[in-house]
A protein has these predicted regions:
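Short, well-ordered, mixed-charge alpha-helical segments that flank or form enzyme active sites
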Residues: 45, 74, 291
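Short, charged N-terminal helix-start/capping segments
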Residues: 2-18, 90-97, 102-118, 175, ...
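FNR/FR-type flavoprotein reductase catalytic core
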Residues: 10, 32, 39, 139-293
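Globin-like tetrapyrrole-binding proteins
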Residues: 1-61
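Ferredoxin-reductase
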Residues: 58-153, 204-206, 233
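Surface-exposed helix-capping loop/turn segments at secondary-structure junctions
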Residues: 24, 106, 166-167
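Long, contiguous hydrophobic alpha-helical segments, chiefly transmembrane helices and signal peptides
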Residues: 1-2, 7-11, 34-41, 45, ...
Length: 293
């Protein structure tokens, strides 16, 4: 989070870097032009960011008590935090929070974004996958999984994000895989309450590794318009165009979230079916530039 008082510091260092590369003095017309341009851009950003801050439940990071930790799958946990200071039900389905943690493992404080699964007036629930491979260990996810316990305090930013339900007069279709289900749960819940046909396709490797099963089952049990379809890779293979086609007859608004390969596969299948991509929305937990639409 960058506040107005930070922009002069950024500008000073940016101009110093430009001078270092170009060899120009601070009074050179080129540097003066850069300084003026930066000032104008900074003013625009400050105004835009202030509008965002005005709609946030709180500014900066605030401490919250962790009241519940649930092992959703072998590598995904959900964390419930509690507050009587803010109305946490005001979060928008699809948004995320940022956690700020410290650990003896790290020489600095680390921050990461995690999508909100659900919430009410006094609680927020967010999901975290323990991100460990042979080549990489997620700094923050391993801290949350291995070092954080119920009763601990954790610093969170206010919910933000632009992944949200759109065109609510149309049927709604959600397609998720793995921890990519995290933002889709609350979106599915909201869509199910809108009295339009609402479907969720949850792609899993095995039936035993199905995150957020209880919440999803509760949504379908309480809303006649909501349907949940489980696609088990070990039994049915990858989710391909021929299977997707049966869910598209009513031209739903589509929301996709999952790993890079999953996103590529679903998006390519929709293109193969000549689906209108203006009604397709997706969220990645990686830089968006790595996923082409």
């Amino acid at each position: 989070q960058v506040y107005p008082e930070h922009y002069p510091i950024v500008g000073e260092n940016l101009l110093a870097a430009i001078q270092d590369v170009t060899g120009l003095e601070s009074d050179d017309p080129v540097i003066q032009t850069w300084a003026k341009a930066y000032g104008e851009i900074a003013d625009v950003f400050i105004k835009l960011e202030q509008e965002i801050y005005n709609h946030m439940l709180w500014k900066g990071f605030k401490p919250f008590k962790i009241t519940n930790i649930t092992q959703e799958t072998s590598d995904i946990k959900s964390f419930t935090v509690e507050s009587d200071e803010y109305d946490l039900s005001q979060f928008e389905p699809g948004q995320y929070i940022t956690v700020d943690v410290s650990s003896e493992k790290l020489p600095y404080r680390a921050k990461r974004h995690y999508s909100i699964i659900d919430g009410d007036e006094n609680h927020l629930i967010f999901g975290v996958k323990r991100d460990v491979t042979t080549e990489h260990e997620g700094e923050v996810s391993t801290i949350l999984h291995d070092e954080i316990s119920e009763g601990d305090m954790i610093n969170l930013s206010a919910p933000v994000g632009g992944f949200s339900i759109e065109n609510t007069e149309r049927p709604q279709l959600f397609i998720g895989s793995g921890v990519g289900m995290t933002p889709l749960v609350s979106m599915f819940k909201k869509a199910a309450s809108l009295n339009v046909p609402t479907q969720m396709i949850q792609a899993v490797v095995t039936e035993d590794e199905r995150p957020f099963a209880q919440k999803l089952d509760s949504i379908t049990a309480n809303h006649e318009q909501a349907q949940l379809h489980l696609h088990v890779k070990d039994k049915e293979g990858y989710l391909e165009a021929k299977e997707l086609e049966q869910y598209l007859s009513e031209q739903p608004e589509i929301y996709i979230c999952g790993g890079t390969n999953f996103l590529h596969s679903i998006i390519n299948s929709l293109k193969e079916l000549n689906y209108d991509m203006n009604h397709v929305h997706f969220e990645t937990f990686i830089p968006r530039l790595s996923v082409q639409v």
